[in-house]
Amino acid sequence: MGAILFVAFFLWLHFAVRSWIIGADAVWTVCNQGGPFGILLPSWLFLCIGIGAGIFFLVQWLKEESWITEWPWLALVAGGLGNLLERQLFGCIMDYIALSPLPVFNVADILLTVGVVGILWSWYLKRKENG
């Protein structure tokens, strides 16, 4: 139940911030119709990749034994699902956080980054533990 609430909260946060930014008529928004780093792929391919990645992350998450190693996988699911839903519902992913020199990004991108860092960190700790 906690996992569903975790993902649901961050999906809500992603879309709440997006709605607020649109309402604020922010000038720093970018409607990204391509993929990461501007890679142009058809939307059906994004959908297939997203579903495949979601299944992979779900399987990995089910293998985890504690919240410490579980949350990074949930962050990846929430971030990926947020961007996937946004692309399917609106035709593009709105990026609205601009921190130079980084590319413009959004809440889902933060979740994806934090999830990857968390997974790498937990793998490092497991390797260190097993010697």
Where are these regions (language model features)?
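Alpha-helical transmembrane bundles and membrane-interface segments of multipass inner-membrane proteins
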Residues: 1-131
